[in-house]
């Protein structure tokens, strides 16, 4: 019997070692991407900290290669370290047809990263006692029909209110104009909730539309004015604005989509007209990479209280390894580095905003191609340039120490000869 236990133990031990080695090799191999030549892609630099020149040069090669792989018309990137902008650069063409080069001041759609902006403004209103995150919204917004349950702002902000998502992609492509967030409630306010608030999670753009209507009513101002007063003006986000198809706006890139949705065949066309007035809070803002870095950096300062920041980055829902806070997703990357982030993907837009809180690194990537799939083999090596280098031998060494520790425990528990007196 003892021999059988030993055999099973060493078999399991060997399997654990094998699985660990295979996982680490797969992680290492997944990042070994052959970079495509991007010398023909124009680039324009705004900020370049010479202290990070090596990392920036490597990142240029990676991002240009990613543009080739994904057929991105333009891409804008900004990186900050310790709340200081160390790199801002744009690549490619803001308009493919006339070959207008993109630059760091080019303005992109940011898609669902708009939710992060809305969430920060919401927390600011809560700090100022303009609304209570935990009180029923109907006390503020009686225009929203009674659903038989209490719905709170924090439930809306964390996608736990039971407000339905889009039934199909076409709901995001509306051309109907609305004059306020309250008016845009007509699109869904009479629909039933899909679950009792607080009992489940369902990512909902309409939930954020309802949240913006609550903010409007609480402040007796339109949503755009609230965002400008509480966020854009104090943080000097001068290029962040709602997308109202205003022809007077300059520096706005041309938006493109793949001819075959979600494909990577290289065939693109201009995005169709969309009126974003009904979904500003969930996906209707324009911005630059530098403006979004200002927002990310501000959360490390005194723009919000530490209590508010902790509330924002608290996990309210989890799906496997992904957690959702107030306008932010949270997860650990393959190297177990904690990150706060949000993605944006829609017609004419793909965006990424990431904070690595333990390393004081913030990163923004914007593109004017809708639903672009940034490959892990490019995205992770790019971010690794500005983070502590993954040390693969350290993983092996830790594995070895853990296995020795387990071996000693098991050996002491089961295999030590008994002394019979």
Where are these predicted regions, by residue range?
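Short, conserved clusters of charged catalytic residues that mark active-site
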Residues: 58-62, 139, 210
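Catalytic loop of the DD-peptidase/beta-lactamase superfamily, centered on the K-T-G motif
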Residues: 2-89, 219-221, 228-229, 233, ...
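Short active-site loop at a secondary-structure junction
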Residues: 69-76, 97-155, 194-206, 280-283, ...
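Short linear capping/connector segments at secondary-structure termini
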Residues: 44-45, 93-95, 106, 136-143, ...
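A short, polar/charged loop-to-alpha-helix boundary motif
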Residues: 94-104, 373-382
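Short, surface-exposed loop or secondary-structure junction motifs
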Residues: 148-345
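Solvent-exposed coil/turn segments that connect beta secondary-structure elements
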Residues: 82, 94-96, 161-162, 247
